[in-house]
Structure formats: structure tokens, C-alpha cells
Amino acid sequence: MHCLIAAMLVVGLGQASGFQEIACPEIYGGHLQGIATDNEQNIYWSFTVALVKTNRAGELLKTVPAPTHQGDLTWVDGKVYVAVNLGKFNQEPGQADSWVYVYDARDLTLLEKRAVPELVHGAGGMAFHDGKFIVVGGLPEGYTENYAYEYDRNLDFVQRHVINSGYTKMGIQTACWFDGAWWFGCYENEKGLLKTDEQFNLLGRFTPNYSVGIAPWTDGNCLRGVTVPLENKQHRGAAVVDLPGKASETAAK
């Protein structure tokens, strides 16, 4: 959710060797924040200050500017939902300004803005499953757990869930429901992908970290977002066809 050193950002592409890769066309301000897919395998790419739609081959369909700082996103029933923080990340309560922006998936027209003040450390990512949205975000140093905030289909707050993951750098960046579990991408270089059950009990930690995008794909696979920094704070993005959870560390007892 914040600027990262180049080595952390390009690590995904280094691990992509041998995997099918879908490139997002053009370059954008800020790094890739998240990816989402719809029922037709169109791909929605969230960069820090841009929202992009491509087809499954990576051909550009639409791009629109976005507020800084836009985060991870999800597609639900013809709409794209994006976690947005207009304030500060990773601070104690009172400094974030957390929102969910809702776009028409057809042409990326902005339809609605919904405040989510419960994300007190900054809204940075979101996913949808079983009639509910889960929004995740930043985390100040010194905390020993992460949080997942549950909202109903109307984006009304339901409850906060605790993930006993220990501290992860800047909290959780991306979220996805896949293969009967929640997956959460963090900026940790090692074991930065968290897997939980439906009740958010930690099941394991995995490498690579999926911190700039995770979304369901075809044939039982996922897309893993990767990003490459260029000059003048510009970035390219891509998605690698991959499968999360191949290398793990035993979950805490």
C-alpha cells in the first residue's frame, strides 16, 4: 500500500519464469495494487492512481484515473469495488480516511463512494465471498495480529475479525477467496501469503507473497500480480498464472 524498494517489487517477475504471463498494456503512476477477474475472464488492474480493464489476453479495454491511494479490488455482479485510503496508512486510529469506490465494470464509470471508517489503519484491499465483503488494510508497527473487516452486500459494517498472523509489514495488501479458503497477500519477502479458513483461523504461510494481486483464474489456477518500477515513479504490471500455497510454513498452533 505504500512505495516499496525496487527489489521487492520485481521479485514476482523473477519468480515468474516458466509460468504463463499476461501483461497489462501501457505504464501507470504508482505500482500495481491488485487484480480482479470477472465471469468472462476480463482482468481489472488497480494501480495507485489508475484503474484499468483488459480482456483475458491483456488487450486494453478501458482505463480511468483513480484517487491516490487506490488499493486492491474485487468484481461482483457487474461492479468493481476498490479499497481506497485518502489519508495515512499504518498509523494509530484517526489518521486514515478509508473508502470503497464502486465502478460499473462495463466502462469503469464511478457509481458510488462508501466510507468505511472501521478501517482505522487505512483500507488497502478487499474480496467477496458468500454474500459478504472482506476489507483489509494497513497495520502500525508493534501490532501482533491483522484484521479483516466484514461488510454485507450493501457495504454496511458487520464485524471485525482477528487474524493471528503476527505482525506483517504494512498489514495486508490483497485478499481473495479461492479453493475454499481466504488468501491474504502481505509485503513480507518470505512466507508473505497468509491462508485462513472461512472463520479466519490461520492455516499456513506461503511463498511467493501475492502482495500486488491475487485473483481466481481458469483451470483451478490463480493470477498472481507482479509489477516492475520504471523511471519517474512509473510502473508496468503483469499477471502470472500460478497456484498459491505450493511452499508453506506450518501455521501457529
Mark where each language-model region is:
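Surface loop/turn motifs at the tips and blade-to-blade linkers of beta-strand repeat domains
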Residues: A23-G29, T63-A66, R114-V120, H161-T168, ...
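Short loop/turn segments that connect beta-strands within beta-propeller blades
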Residues: N55-E59, D104-L108, D152-D156, T196-N201
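Beta-strand-rich domains and repeat architectures in extracellular enzymes and scaffolds
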Residues: I22-V49, H69-D72
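Blade-loop segments of beta-propeller domains
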Residues: E59-S98
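Residue-level detector of Asp-centered blade-edge/turn motifs that repeat once per structural unit
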Residues: T37-E40, W75-G78, F128-D130, W177-G180, ...
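Short, solvent-exposed loop/turn segments at conserved positions within beta-propeller repeat blades
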Residues: W45-S46, F89-S98, L139-N146, Y187-N189, ...
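Beta-rich catalytic cores
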Residues: G30-H31, T68-H69, A96, V120-G122, ...
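Conserved beta-propeller blade signature
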Residues: N42-Y44, V80-V82, F133-V136, W182-G185, ...
